[in-house]
Curated annotation (Swiss-Prot):
It is an enzyme of class 1 (oxidoreductase). It catalyses: L-pipecolate + O2 = L-1-piperideine-6-carboxylate + H2O2 + H(+). It comes from Arthroderma benhamiae (strain ATCC MYA-4681 / CBS 112371). GO terms for molecular function: L-pipecolate oxidase activity. Belongs to the NmrA-type oxidoreductase family. Isoflavone reductase subfamily. Pathway: Mycotoxin biosynthesis. The gene is swnR. Transmembrane segments: none annotated. This is Oxidoreductase swnR. Its EC number is 1.5.3.7. Keywords: NADP, Oxidoreductase. It holds the Pfam family NAD_binding_10. Oxidoreductase; part of the gene cluster that mediates the biosynthesis of swainsonine (SW), a cytotoxic fungal alkaloid and a potential cancer therapy drug. Swainsonine production occurs via a multibranched pathway and is dispensable for fungal colonization of plants and infection of insect hosts. The first step of swainsonine biosynthesis is the production of the precursor pipecolic acid (PA) via conversion of L-lysine (Lys) to 1-piperideine-6-carboxylate (P6C) by the aminotransferase swnA, the latter being further reduced to PA by the reductase swnR.
Length: 305
């Protein structure tokens, strides 16, 4: 199957490896030529993300997946253009926008900094009928638990409760709130399987999960295996509210949004739906637990998880 990928971000690097392995042909939409992309089964198309520049590329693709993670209003405008380009394409009638976050079916406004730019795109998809689409929900990426050299996913430092660089854990809430974790490579494998599902079988939300746990248990595991002296502190809901009240910059507000993301329990993927989607869309995909991924890291400490 020929698949178009909008953007060459962190997740795209896993997609390039796993989609080719699954037998798909990829064309990466990018604003500038990237020599590292060129390999068997993968080509690139230079675009300025206008309808005219997308038309020829999408003409013979069956699916468009976006990994564009822009945090500005450009996210909204580019995704609206991608939707329109698919609608005008004779063949590309399936679209997956760049979500890949938490349980946005139940908590559509989490994290807060996502909502304003993502919701208009979701609404546009809901209000049309000539494209099949789905919003993929994965919880937290498990990759943040390994060093940066072992993942394509970039560091987010203090925005992740386990901060490798600072060698400390700052856990939002009680730390017992449920959180689901999924490895990025397994997400890519899941997407490669999802696009092979029969036409008309997609649902508005697709759920993946490698493991249901909580931040306290994950921090204890990291202390046990790698960082026995790592200090752990907790940030309460009240303290987070005070952070927001006293915030003088955007970075503080974003950090508070990350805290609320865990405290609200939005990071918990509905287990019944994850199980149903595993059977329906991913019957041959093994979603690794955190321990399984860390065991692979221990065995091959120079590999990309």
């Amino acid at each position: 199957m020929k698949v178009a990928i909008a953007g060459y971000g962190d997740l795209t690097r896993y997609i390039c490896e796993e989609f080719v392995q699954a037998g798909h042909e990829l064309v990466i939409l990018t604003r500038s030529f990237k020599p590292q992309i060129e390999s068997p089964g993968i080509s690139q198309a230079i675009t300025d993300y206008t309808i005219s520049s997308l038309k020829a590329t999408l003409a013979d693709c069956e699916v468009l997946i976006s990994t564009i993670g822009d945090m500005s209003n450009a996210y909204t405008s580019v995704h609206h253009t991608l939707i329109q380009a698919c609608q005008e394409s004779p063949k590309c009638k399936r679209f997956i926008p760049a979500e890949f976050a938490v349980n946005i079916e139940t908590y559509p406004d989490e994290p807060g900094f996502y909502y304003a730019i993502h919701e208009p795109v979701r609404e546009t998809l809901r209000n049309q009928t000539n494209l099949e689409w789905t919003l993929v929900c994965i919880g937290w990426l498990a990759d943040y638990f390994v060093p940066s050299k072992n993942r394509y996913i970039k560091d987010i430092d203090e925005c992740h409760p386990i901060n490798w660089k600072a060698n400390k854990a700052v856990i939002p809430g009680t730390g017992n709130e449920p959180v689901d974790f999924t490895w990025a490579r397994d997400v890519a494998k899941g997407l490669a399987s999802l696009i092979q599902a029969p036409t008309g079988s997609w649902e508005p939300y697709t759920f993946m999960s490698g493991e249901r746990s909580c931040w306290n248990d994950m921090a204890a595991l990291i202390k046990e295996k790698y960082r026995p002296d790592m200090p752990i502190e907790h940030v309460s809901l009240h303290a987070t509210a005070n952070m927001i009240k006293a915030a003088k910059d955007e970075d503080t507000l974003i950090l508070a949004d990350y805290y609320l993301l865990s405290i609200s329990q939005a990071c918990a993927i509905p287990q019944d739906k994850a199980k149903a989607h595993k059977e329906k869309f991913f019957p041959h995909i093994h979603f690794r637990t955190l321990r399984e991924g860390l065991s692979q890291f221990d065995e091959k400490p120079n590999s990309i998880m």
